[in-house]
């Protein structure tokens, strides 16, 4: 028979019971390492987590289709082929991400970081058509955008990926010419149209204060985040 509690006995009060439940869940799922949907660390750290989290098996061959200086892979021991259109970065392969020099089903993972810095005045060093090897110029009336790159890249990424392969895309929305460019939405639509299944989205938040702009008046919120989009060459994500 249960002992009856005395009216003078102090009753234990748990201030945050949900924390106690979560602690028990963590102990019972010791092998489970959740990936947060908001990330404040570096891209290299996040990529390493995603490469452990999303592929069904450990990827043997990875393509970074826009490797630039290779900052995503600093300290990494993974087998990564870095491609860039600019030979000054000394990539493994000099090539155009809209027309890749690889055979069908060559990679387990493709990583893509498309340009998101539009033309800025008369400074030629900031001309994205020169810096990124773009052939087509978007219209000033549309505020300049890079959306014409997405369909041909997605077609090539789908071709060079193996079955159930993963596409990771880091992408940022931006404002140019007072026009908001919904880059992440346009990329998702382009990838789905090619045959990819859109599986996940991680918001990467930039640390540090927002820099003071040179403009007197702002019409849009300042961008302080970007997205890592996850796609699979499959009909389902799991």
Where in this protein do the model-derived segments appear?
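Class I S-adenosyl-L-methionine-dependent methyltransferase catalytic core
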Residues: 1-238
């Amino acid at each position: 028979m249960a002992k009856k509690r005395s009216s003078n006995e102090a009753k234990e009060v748990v201030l945050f019971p949900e924390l106690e439940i979560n602690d028990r869940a963590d102990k019972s799922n010791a092998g489970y390492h959740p990936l947060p949907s908001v990330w404040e660390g570096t891209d290299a750290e996040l990529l390493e987590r995603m490469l452990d989290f999303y592929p069904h098996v450990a990827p043997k061959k990875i393509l970074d289709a826009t490797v630039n200086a290779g900052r995503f892979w600093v300290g990494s021991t993974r087998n990564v082929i870095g491609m860039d259109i600019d030979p000054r970065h000394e990539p493994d392969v000099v090539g155009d991400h809209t027309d890749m020099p690889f055979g069908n089903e060559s990679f387990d993972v493709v990583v893509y970081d498309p340009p998101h810095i539009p033309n800025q005045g008369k400074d030629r060093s900031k001309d994205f058509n020169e810096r990124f090897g773009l052939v087509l110029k978007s219209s000033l009336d549309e505020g300049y955008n890079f959306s014409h790159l997405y369909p041909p890249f997605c077609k090539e990424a789908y071709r060079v990926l193996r079955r159930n392969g993963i596409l990771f895309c880091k992408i940022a929305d931006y404002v140019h010419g007072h026009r908001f460019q919904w880059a992440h939405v346009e990329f998702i639509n382009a990838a789905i149209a090619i045959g990819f299944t859109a599986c996940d989205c991680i918001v990467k938040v930039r640390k540090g204060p927002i820099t003071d702009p040179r403009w007197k008046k702002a019409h849009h919120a300042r961008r302080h985040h970007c997205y890592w989009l996850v796609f699979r060459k499959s009909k389902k994500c799991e």
